[in-house]
Amino acid sequence: MSETLLRRRYRFFGAVQGVGLRWRARHAAETLGATGWVCNNADGSVTMELQGSEAQLDRVLQTLAESRYIEILDTEMQQLPLETGERGFSVRDDRW
């Protein structure tokens, strides 16, 4: 039996830019087989869309929470429809 796939958009607030969050997210997602993207926002927050099993998503978030220098003070989360055919995880250009 296969695990149910989920897609969620997260928006992180706190000390989240200039501390390696995007690259850590990419490494964790790629290692775990999750897909999606991450980018910096002009207001100092970071947005990430992540697709995978509940366990994969939880593990990526846990990796970020346990990372040195990254200090997530607040997180907004939104459920999204699945992106069929999506491959890999990318760091997108900043949203300025």
Where are these regions (language model features)?
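Intrinsically disordered, low-complexity, mixed-charge
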Residues: 1-96
